[in-house]
């Protein structure tokens, strides 16, 4: 703006340039460099346009940070766009006002039954999986609606963070966890032998859930003694991302019915999360592309 002050209405320089530069605390070199560069097109404009196109693909994409935006650009390879480093992508995002800063995180809701029999912690915080349907995590979260609370239960595959089982209800009984497991087994019959890790909530230590685990030949894993939240950090992270991307600053959930909440959550997980969303916490974001291809066959 200081450089603009040195120009007349017709755009020509007027007066003693050296004097004006001293008054405005700018250098003559900087001023003349501004004159040379001001009419040149911004070299990152094609990149900025490509990033805006990515955000426009889905309403939830506006939560993309530097990493996922960089990965999206690398996957899509937009025409006539030279993809720079991730750091430069971040600078351009800041410049055009689309950088994302994470906000709130949800708290866990399940309560441990100290008297119930527990299963061993088979994962020991190692959420890395070389193949699909070998390591999974499960948990529940709650969302307040105008007619009560909606409880969402899901099973996530550690390989690519995809949702393989999903169920929702207005109660958080063990039957909800059992339904989630049954939905996963129906959709993925080869889940037999997989490890499914959970916290020590009464739903997961119940006889009903244990019988379902045995029925489908699944290995049950639970948080270590003491119920440390980090033992199931992967699942807690999924809920945090879902609420940040889908709910926070978009919907006033307490003015929505539980049926309305069910609709947007089903759509989010089945249409967006499992098909189009880039998850930077996976082994490699290219695994998500492979999963998309499989789902569309």
Predicted feature locations:
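Short alpha-helical "recognition helix" segments of helix-turn-helix
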Residues: 17-22, 69
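Short conserved beta-strand segments at catalytic cores or DNA/RNA-binding microdomains
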Residues: 22-25, 140-173, 182-185
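Mobile-element integrase/transposase regions
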Residues: 83, 90-154, 178-180, 187-193
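RNase H-like two-metal-ion nuclease catalytic core shared by retroviral integrases
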Residues: 109-112, 198-200, 206-210, 222-244, ...
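Active-site proximal helix-loop segment of RNase H-like, two-metal nucleases, encompassing DDE(D)
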Residues: 217-221, 234-258, 266-279
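Conserved small/polar residues in nucleotide/adenosyl-binding loops
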Residues: 286-295
